[in-house]
A protein has these predicted regions:
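Acidic donor-binding loop of glycosyltransferase active sites
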Residues: 111, 230-248, 263
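A short, well-ordered alpha-helix in the C-terminal region of glycosyltransferases
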Residues: 298, 305-320, 326-332
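Carbohydrate-associated surface elements
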Residues: 119, 137
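Conserved acidic donor-binding segment of nucleotide-sugar-dependent glycosyltransferases
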Residues: 279-290, 298-304
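Nucleotide-activated donor-binding/catalytic signature segment of Leloir-type glycosyltransferases, i.e.
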Residues: 194, 201-228
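Membrane-proximal helix-turn-helix segments that form the acceptor-binding/catalytic region
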Residues: 37-45, 60-61, 65-69, 76-84, ...
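Conserved donor-binding/catalytic core segment of Leloir-type glycosyltransferases
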Residues: 149-183, 192
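Short acidic/histidine- and often glycine-rich active-site loop of Leloir-type glycosyltransferases
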Residues: 248-249, 269-280, 284-285
């Protein structure tokens, strides 16, 4: 019970034992149907509950069926693009993307929708007039910088994420190309690539081609341990190569985490970063590779700039993107039903 609203999470992975991460992609249709059946058996006991469907995937069908048969109200919370890039409707009704069709049907039937990005807000707004923008945000109590951070002996630049989409590999390739150019001038800089996913082998081959000993691939780090890692880096980066639906839809959780830890960031001027980062104030925006390199260079050369920009970044997330602020907004939205 928080904020006076009783709630419960039904996670297919944690509650029902479903495979997640890389394991999810190996699941067959029979396994997914069984899990939805188990979830539906739990949900039919909640006759007066509101079902909040968090992102669209195979797990969405159990609460959707609960809505159809039991008339439970539903809320659709979309924080990612889980559909084909450019879906088409043949003859005006037959979809090339079943996920796109199902997502828009769920949106139409929801009492309201939650979007984690402005792009998704516009997408959902085509099917539901009540769409509220709530980004993923960050737990500012967990992601809290140490008061006395020792001076860095080396500059560590960090990219954090998953490798479950080829777009991520493209974005890392962009970052690597920028990094190797910076290394010509700055010999003692290091790049960490942190995460895991089904395209990790592709990432390893990519990094191997660059043949730079100052680039490290690090395993996935648990959320509770992430603040410890982030205390040891100097710069966070959010490179984005292409302006497509997937990249535009992302709510940049790792950007919020960098900012909460008072780390200055350099972000591509694509997608959500453009609404979060004030260029030159609480971070940097870069419109192309040359500008990305230039602004990373500013931060590498100037420790005072890193400190000042990081402090302003922390203020930004405390004001707008902390879980406390966002949960308060969500409570107000729920009370409006």
């Amino acid at each position: 019970m928080k904020y006076g609203i009783e709630s419960e999470v039904c996670s297919f992975a944690d509650t029902l034992g479903a495979r997640d991460g890389e394991g999810e992609s190996a699941m067959g249709i029979a396994e997914k149907i069984k899990l939805n059946y188990l979830a539906f058996k739990r949900l039919i006991k909640e006759k007066n509950s509101i079902f909040c469907i968090q992102r669209f995937n195979y797990h969405s069908f159990a609460p959707y069926l609960g809505h159809l048969f039991l008339r439970n109200k539903i809320i659709f919370d979309l924080d990612d693009w889980e559909m084909r890039e450019n879906p088409k409707y043949y003859f005006g009704f037959y979809p090339s993307s079943k996920a796109h069709f199902c997502a828009r049907e769920i949106a139409k039937r929801s009492v309201f929708c939650i979007s984690a990005s402005r792009f998704l807000q516009h997408f959902l707004g085509r099917f539901n007039r009540k769409v509220h923008y709530l980004p993923s945000g960050v737990d500012t109590q967990l992601f809290n910088p140490a008061e006395n951070i020792p001076a860095a002996e080396k500059i560590v630049i960090s990219w954090i994420g998953t490798f479950n989409k080829m777009e991520y590999i493209e974005n890392i390739d962009f970052a690597l190309r920028c990094f190797v150019k910076l290394r010509k001038k700055h010999k003692d800089i290091h790049l960490d690539i942190v995460g895991d996913g089904i395209y990790k082998d592709s990432l390893v081959r990519l990094v191997t081609r660059f043949n730079d000993s100052n680039v490290r691939i690090k395993d996935w780090i648990a959320p509770d341990e992430m603040p410890i890692y982030l205390r040891g880096i100097q710069i966070g980066i959010l490179p984005v190569r292409r302006s497509n639906s997937f990249n535009l839809s992302k709510s940049p959780t790792k950007l919020f985490e960098y900012m909460a830890m008072q780390k200055p960031t350099v972000c591509s001027a694509i997608g959500e970063a453009m609404d979060i980062v004030k260029d030159g104030d609480n971070g940097y925006l870069a419109c192309d590779a040359d500008m990305f390199i230039k602004k990373m260079g500013y931060l590498i050369d100037n420790s005072s700039l890193r400190k000042q920009m990081g402090a302003r970044a922390r203020e930004s997330v405390e004001d707008k993107y902390s879980l406390g602020v966002l949960c308060g907004q969500f409570k107000e939205i729920l009370e409006s039903i």
